[in-house]
From Swiss-Prot:
<comment type="similarity">
    <text>Belongs to the cytochrome b family.</text>
</comment>
<dbReference type="InterPro" id="IPR016174">
    <property type="entry name" value="Di-haem_cyt_TM"/>
</dbReference>
<dbReference type="InterPro" id="IPR048260">
    <property type="entry name" value="Cytochrome_b_C_euk/bac"/>
</dbReference>
<feature type="transmembrane region" description="Helical">
    <location>
        <begin position="77"/>
        <end position="98"/>
    </location>
</feature>
<feature type="binding site" description="axial binding residue">
    <location>
        <position position="83"/>
    </location>
    <ligand>
        <name>heme b b562</name>
    </ligand>
</feature>
<feature type="transmembrane region" description="Helical">
    <location>
        <begin position="347"/>
        <end position="367"/>
    </location>
</feature>
<dbReference type="InterPro" id="IPR005797">
    <property type="entry name" value="Cyt_b/b6_N"/>
</dbReference>
<dbReference type="GO" id="GO:0005743">
    <property type="term" value="C:mitochondrial inner membrane"/>
</dbReference>
<keyword id="KW-0679">Respiratory chain</keyword>
<dbReference type="InterPro" id="IPR030689">
    <property type="entry name" value="Cytochrome_b"/>
</dbReference>
<keyword id="KW-0813">Transport</keyword>
<dbReference type="GO" id="GO:0045275">
    <property type="term" value="C:respiratory chain complex III"/>
</dbReference>
<keyword id="KW-0408">Iron</keyword>
<keyword id="KW-0999">Mitochondrion inner membrane</keyword>
<keyword id="KW-0830">Ubiquinone</keyword>
<feature type="transmembrane region" description="Helical">
    <location>
        <begin position="33"/>
        <end position="53"/>
    </location>
</feature>
<comment type="subunit">
    <text>The cytochrome bc1 complex contains 11 subunits: 3 respiratory subunits (MT-CYB, CYC1 and UQCRFS1), 2 core proteins (UQCRC1 and UQCRC2) and 6 low-molecular weight proteins (UQCRH/QCR6, UQCRB/QCR7, UQCRQ/QCR8, UQCR10/QCR9, UQCR11/QCR10 and a cleavage product of UQCRFS1). This cytochrome bc1 complex then forms a dimer.</text>
</comment>
Amino acid sequence: MTNIRKTHPLIKIVNHSFIDLPAPSNISAWWNFGSLLGLCLAIQILTGLFLAMHYTSDTMTAFSSVTHICRDVNYGWLIRYMHANGASMFFICLFLHVGRGLYYGSYIYFETWNIGVILLFVVMATAFMGYVLPWGQMSFWGATVITNLLSAIPYIGAXXVEWIWGGFSVDKATLTRFFAFHFILPFIIAALTMVHLLFLHETGSNNPLGLVSDSDKVPFHPYYTIKDILGVLLLILALMTLILFSPDLLGDPDNYTPANPLSTPPHIKPEWYFLFAYAILRSIPNKLGGVLALAFSILILMLFPLLHLSKQRSMMFRPLSQCVFWILVADLFTLTWIGGQPVEYPFIVIGQLASILYFTIILLILPTASLIENKLLKW
């Protein structure tokens, strides 16, 4: 009798994706983040579902309902903090996953890469809308500031902002629609993830050497299932340590104050994972210019397949490009730090320099380094 795993229409799909999938024999721990992102998404959908059972999306009761979840619901505090800190873990895994793709040239599979960039955008939109839901001070003012950016669009800007708000300011209509979108988007993310994997499995995984690995494949199970389980355990350990020891480490104290349209917090800033983009936005004095720079700071990822001028795929044997890559990483850390600082003398200049460096490295220095390496290798 033929194995049901290989004949049943549904189980066959799972088999070809997670069991009998041919995988390169040398992929490192940097390839674990895909499965960890899947785990993060599952955690977020499950905890989010239980939070939605107790949350009310009304301006009068939203803040109280979150308090109620933390105080009165059985293990509500745990579910709430798993959801909030799960988002941080999600973004840590996302940034490492994208960084791995940049370092090892995974963007050469451009369908997989571009769907990944779209996924990044959708996850960022979901996280932003989720941050508005507790209706604290930073929720309200964050929503006001970020939605207001659309007013920079010529001619239709002002009308578009009021359309998104559902009124003349961030209010009940805004909160309700953000809750609706925040609920539906994770399922859209899950669907896009399937497409992401579909395209990946058309070509097979890249590997650290950036070479074709068809001659040396191993089955995904048991080799990479056991490896993924180790990653999963480490992620859960890190997440639970964060939740149980310092759940508010990455949050903003202002969000424990109920939203008040009449009092603006001294420093409006988003969650830590948006700070690098926020710093780029703030470093340009012109509103429209800032918004364009903000959008382009993520969209620029889609240009990587076009900017790849090296004859080698991976950076593993390209010391010059490696050096530039790590400068880019340091620059992103600098931008993240600047995004959380007030807009005053030293920070403004540092932010502007870091923003210029970010775009210069990607558009100019990395391609130039690739050409120099080609020349040095007489290629």
